[in-house]
């Protein structure tokens, strides 16, 4: 029986902090599903398809990582792919309260599902997708916080937005 984990997130866009958690999880599990969700409480900057493409490129050299889109309840998705673990990255203590609420609800819905928290390496602890977009929007250098393909995608997206009347 394979040891399967799910790393859910909006990944809008994926950062080196996300990639750190994905790589380390890939060393712990037989299969890691990076599951892209559409967060209704957030306005998406990149489309789901663009996010999946960027993540797939960033993880292409990690053979046991699969990238997929899902909608609906995370517990249902985990059951569909045979995962018994959810991996969540934590940047700081401030992330924990929200994550604990999610974990409690998932546990209420499926008592067999476990959530594992992984601290992001210190060099990535300040990075968020929102902050990354803000820096890129004003032409700041994001090369040290996102994979190269994401840096290019951000530049292209903002160039396109700035060309609009």
Swiss-Prot record:
The keyword Cytoplasm applies. Substrate binds at residues 10, 42, 74, 88. GO terms for biological process: coenzyme A biosynthetic process. CDD domains: PPAT. One of its GO terms (molecular function) is pantetheine-phosphate adenylyltransferase activity. The record marks 18 as: Transition state stabilizer. Keywords: ATP-binding, Coenzyme A biosynthesis, Cytoplasm, Magnesium, Nucleotide-binding, Nucleotidyltransferase, Transferase. It catalyses: (R)-4'-phosphopantetheine + ATP + H(+) = 3'-dephospho-CoA + diphosphate. Pathway: Cofactor biosynthesis; coenzyme A biosynthesis; CoA from (R)-pantothenate: step 4/5. Pfam families: CTP_transf_like (PF01467). It is an enzyme of class 2 (transferase). Gene3D superfamilies: HUPs. ATP binds at residues 10-11, 18, 89-91, 99, 124-130. It is found in: Cytoplasm. SUPFAM superfamilies: Nucleotidylyl transferase (SSF52374). Its cofactor is Mg(2+). One of its GO terms (cellular component) is cytoplasm. InterPro entries: Cyt_trans-like, PPAT, Rossmann-like_a/b/a_fold. Its main location: cytoplasm. Its EC number is 2.7.7.3. Reversibly transfers an adenylyl group from ATP to 4'-phosphopantetheine, yielding dephospho-CoA (dPCoA) and pyrophosphate. Homohexamer. Belongs to the bacterial CoaD family. PANTHER family: PHOSPHOPANTETHEINE ADENYLYLTRANSFERASE. This is Phosphopantetheine adenylyltransferase. It comes from Macrococcus caseolyticus (strain JCSC5402).
């Amino acid at each position: 029986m394979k040891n399967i984990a799910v790393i859910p997130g909006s990944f809008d866009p994926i950062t080196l902090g996300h990639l750190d958690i994905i790589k380390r999880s890939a060393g712990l599990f037989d299969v890691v599903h990076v599951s892209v969700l559409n967060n209704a409480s957030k306005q998406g900057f990149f489309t789901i398809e663009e996010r999946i493409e960027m993540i797939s490129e960033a993880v292409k050299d990690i053979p046991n990582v699969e990238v997929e889109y899902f909608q609906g309840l995370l517990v249902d998705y985990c059951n569909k792919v045979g995962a018994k673990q959810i991996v969540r990255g934590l940047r700081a203590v401030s992330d924990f309260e929200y994550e604990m609420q999610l974990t409690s609800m998932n546990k209420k819905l499926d008592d067999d599902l476990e959530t594992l928290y992984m601290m992001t390496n210190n060099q990535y602890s300040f990075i968020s997708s929102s902050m990354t977009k803000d820096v890129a929007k004003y032409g700041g250098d994001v090369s040290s916080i996102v994979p190269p393909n994401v840096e290019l995608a951000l530049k292209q997206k903002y160039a396109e937005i700035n060309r609009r009347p």
